Amino acid sequence: ENNERMLSMDRPQYVNWIVREAGVVFEDQQPLNCYRLSYVIDDAILDDWALHIRRHYVPDDELEEDAALNKLTVEEYLRQYVIPQKGEPFGPTARSNDISEILFADLFEFILNYEVPRCKQHNRSGKNESEHGTDIIAYRFFAEGKAPHKNDELVAIEVKALLSSNEAGKVIKDAVTDSKKDEDRVSHTLNYYRKKLRFMGKSTEA
């Protein structure tokens, strides 16, 4: 049951804040599909969002067991071994990257109706070390029953995060440039996900 959450997440409440912005174009007048968070300060929704993010790293029962085995409280274990911290080398970058990737995974799954494996942050070798390969993979089957079809979709997603909007144009260009690498990386990422999902007990999805 816990590993099932790593592949198929419950819809977090904050997703209702995601709205599409119309009429956005890039420098060359190329239209862009843009979304923004139209949020309000709501502690219950923010707490639910935080729990949603944490479950990408470690499911509930596994967290309690790991903390107990290390003779730490749950909060101590998360800070020391799981969640990137701002005072650590590469911690802020790792945390920004993780949250951005989870946000885009939620967009593709809950707004655009793709299936998105949730295993990248799970049990990685270092909490401040992002996994290599394609940032996010999303897919959608055309036929019922997931029978192979020529109209099946596989999307390789390159995620870039920026704290300021001043260099948004450069970030978009960088994402386009780096996305071309995914033609080479996506097959390796698919194989990595297949093996990791099998390790997590999700042989059918793998």
Explain the meaning of each model-derived region:
Residues 165-206:
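Acidic, metal/cofactor-coordinating or nucleic-acid-engaging core segments within structured domains
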Residues 82-105, 125-126:
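A short, highly charged nucleic-acid-interacting micro-segment common to nuclease
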Residues 139-156:
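Active-site beta-strand-loop-beta-strand hairpin of nuclease catalytic cores
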